[in-house]
């Protein structure tokens, strides 16, 4: 993040093992048909191998895709449930968490070779955050006693053995992030909360009417960014905080118009003063903490989820299934994959820089 906050965690035993069907980018892109039916790399070659750059992407039923070389080659891991991953988080190359559309929380301590179920929730899960092997947070909504749905944050401080619940009424929660075991931020469509006690208590810090706030990231306990868009204009919005979320300032994104809704911010990632925000038109990027911005073009797809292992290595998923990767902070993006390889687009990605093997 300067230490980049990834998301992830846990451990316990009952659930899920590996499948590492080693799948090179050629297998990932060539998929089912004969070699003469379509090119092996319909979007061009995959990135050059970057040993030690690990990433995990979810969205498929019962499994996820994983790379240990920055996206040059991929393998499949299985968690053996007929559910799709909704979010994934890793705090290092070994320790990770995953949540599914069935409300299941899983954890790994070996980089995803084996996954264990640590919690079956009653929530429609939206997001996941983690800071260590013991601490994780799950955001979603569940049925209220009086009818309707109530926004909820579940938290564990013992690797998933026990969980506590905090309710937020009718708020439409969208994302959560933690910089360490105590300092975190929580988003709703138009609100931002902060905590300094691991989520036991939350303080409402900012309300932004007529917005959709979609994503939050932190690089340490003080520096944070929130992305979203203005519901009246469709323009992208990025807010920054230098005091752990107590106060916020709007950043100006001076980029050329790209059509109605084309710049609506979806997800934000940060590393060492670099920022990336996905939008339908490409990736909005800053190399100076948000003072200046550019729209980075991508060769295929509409970027959705994004994660940065460091200031150079960034990976993103798309609506239309190609996976995007950059080894130079987004100056050049490469796309690889084939639409008939994945059943559905990948919806979340986590990335971590570890030692090269």
Where are the model-predicted features located?
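Bacterial N-terminal signal peptides
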Residues: 15-27
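Bacterial N-terminal signal peptides that target proteins for export
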Residues: 4-18
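Residue-level hotspots at or immediately adjacent to binding/recognition sites across diverse folds
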Residues: 29-357
């Amino acid at each position: 993040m300067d230490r980049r906050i990834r998301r992830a965690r846990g451990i316990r035993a009952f659930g899920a093992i590996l499948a590492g069907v080693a799948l090179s980018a050629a297998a990932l892109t060539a998929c089912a048909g004969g070699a003469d039916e379509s090119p092996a790399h319909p979007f061009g070659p995959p990135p050059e191998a970057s040993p030690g750059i690990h990433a995990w992407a979810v969205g498929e039923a019962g499994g996820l895709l994983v790379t240990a070389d920055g996206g040059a080659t991929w393998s499949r891991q299985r968690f053996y449930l007929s559910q799709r991953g909704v979010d994934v988080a890793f705090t290092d190359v070994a320790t990770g968490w995953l949540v599914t559309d069935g409300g299941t929380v899983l954890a790994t301590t070996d980089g995803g070779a084996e996954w264990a179920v640590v919690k079956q929730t009653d929530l429609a899960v939206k997001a996941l955050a983690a800071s260590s092997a013991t601490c994780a947070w799950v955001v979603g909504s569940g049925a209220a006693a009086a009818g309707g749905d109530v926004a909820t944050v579940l938290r564990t401080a013992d690797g998933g053995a026990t969980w506590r619940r905090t309710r937020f009424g009718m708020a439409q929660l969208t994302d959560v992030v933690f910089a360490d075991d105590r300092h975190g931020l929580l988003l709703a469509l138009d609100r931002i909360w902060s905590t300094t006690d691991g989520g036991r208590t939350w303080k409402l810090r900012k309300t932004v009417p007529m917005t959709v706030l979609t994503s939050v990231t932190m690089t340490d306990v003080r520096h944070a960014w929130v992305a979203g868009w203005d519901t009246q204009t469709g323009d992208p919005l990025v807010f920054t905080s230098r005091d752990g979320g107590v106060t916020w300032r709007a950043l100006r994104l001076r980029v050329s118009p790209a059509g109605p809704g084309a710049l609506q911010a979806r997800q934000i990632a940060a590393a060492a003063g670099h920022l990336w925000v996905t939008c339908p038109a490409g990736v909005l990027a800053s190399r100076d903490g948000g003072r200046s911005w550019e729209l980075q073009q991508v060769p295929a797809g509409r970027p959705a989820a994004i994660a940065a292992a460091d200031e150079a290595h960034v990976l993103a998923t798309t609506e239309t299934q190609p996976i995007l990767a950059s080894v130079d902070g987004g100056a050049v993006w490469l796309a690889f994959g084939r639409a008939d390889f994945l059943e559905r687009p990948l919806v979340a990605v986590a990335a971590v820089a570890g030692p090269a093997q």
